[in-house]
Amino acid sequence: LMRSSAASDVYKRQALVTVKPVADNSFFMQLDDSTTLLPVNMKNSPYGEKEVRALVNFDPVNESSGEYDKAVHINWIDSILTKPIAGDLGDKNDEVYGTDPVDMINDWVTIAEDGYLTLRFRTMWGNRSQAHFVNLLMSKDAENPYEVEFRHNAFGDVYGEPADGLVAFNLDSLPDTEGKTVKLKLKWKSFNGEKTAEFDYCTRKSVSYTHL
């Protein structure tokens, strides 16, 4: 599942970004660990003061980007379910967070960047009105602080047709890598048993802007 983001080129029109609100109710978008985008046709974030991961389609424009790297025109933007790492409930983990299987899809949106682990997963969906519950848990092994586990609770909706979901997890509760790149190990229960994958991970660099 280690993947370089296909969105790393600012001139690609569809990208995975972090929508970051700033002090004056405006926002910018973080394209990857080092590239920022200024949306010239949207002054206020559609997600208010929430920081979220999102899929965006944009065109670069030849306008001033101020303190940001590139000015862009947003054609459409769609947020991804964005969650913190879940709390450890001990003996209740299986009951609450579930043990239902998923397959992880190895594509350009499955990536660890900008302090998030974004995942495309596939599972069975029978009742489209039944919400599934997905979470990320930290390892209980103190010697493996960069090990996390994906959990899925289908609430009994385990038959039907395969379909994909997207989720992004904020990794800020993991230990600071202090500028180093480490291996982040993801564990999950697949339809073929327990599986793991590794991602290159570095704690998010501080990027703070107060105005556009």
Question: What is each PLM-predicted segment?
Answer:
Residues 13-212:
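First exposed extracellular module after export/assembly in secreted or surface-exposed proteins
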